[in-house]
Amino acid sequence: MITALDHIAIAVPDLERAVARFLEDFGLQHDGNEVVDAAKTTTAFFSVPPTHIELVHPLDGGGPIATYLEKRGGGLHHLCFRTDDIDADVARLREKGYQFTSDAPTPGAHGSRVIFIHPKSCDGVLIELSQPAEAHS
C-alpha cells in the first residue's frame, strides 16, 4: 500500500551548483550524495520534513537523466510514493492497466527497491514507487 510522498526529484545539469543553491540560498539540510548505478545517477538528498528533495545528475553523461536534460535542460523529473509492499502495488496497478518502464523493481538509493510508472499512465507525470530497505523505513 502507498503510505507517503517519499520525495520529489529534480534533474539538474550542474550538481555542485544545484547543491550550493539548496544549501546556501534555501537553507536546506543536505543529507549527502549517493551514486545509484542502476539509475546511472549521482543523487544529492535534502530533508524537507516530512519529505525529501533529490537532485539527480547523470553519471558519465549517460542514462535516462542525461536524455531528460538534453531534451528539457533540467526541471521536475518525478514524484515518488513510498510503499510498504511494492510487489503487491505493482500487481494491483498492472491489473488496472498501468504501464511501467521496467518489468520488475530495481535497486534504488539507500537499498530501496523502486519501479517507475510510465508517464502515459499518469497524465504525463513520471511516478516512482519505492519500498525502503528495513533500515530506512
Can you describe what each PLM-predicted range is?
Residues 1-19, 74-83, 133-137:
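N-terminal beta-strand motif that seeds the catalytic metal site of vicinal oxygen chelate
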Residues 4-6, 28-40, 60-77, 92, ...:
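A cross-kingdom feature marking solvent-exposed beta-strand/loop segments within repeated
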Residues 5, 12, 22, 46, ...:
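Short, structured motif recognition centered on aromatic/hydrophobic residues
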Residues 11-41:
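N-terminal first-folded block
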Residues 19-20, 66, 87-91:
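Alpha-helical elements of the RecA-like P-loop NTPase motor core of helicases
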Residues 36-52:
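C-terminal "cap" of GNAT-fold acetyltransferases
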Residues 44-45, 81, 90-137:
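Vicinal oxygen chelate
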Residues 50-53, 60-62, 86:
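Short, charged/polar surface micro-motifs in flexible loops or helix N-caps
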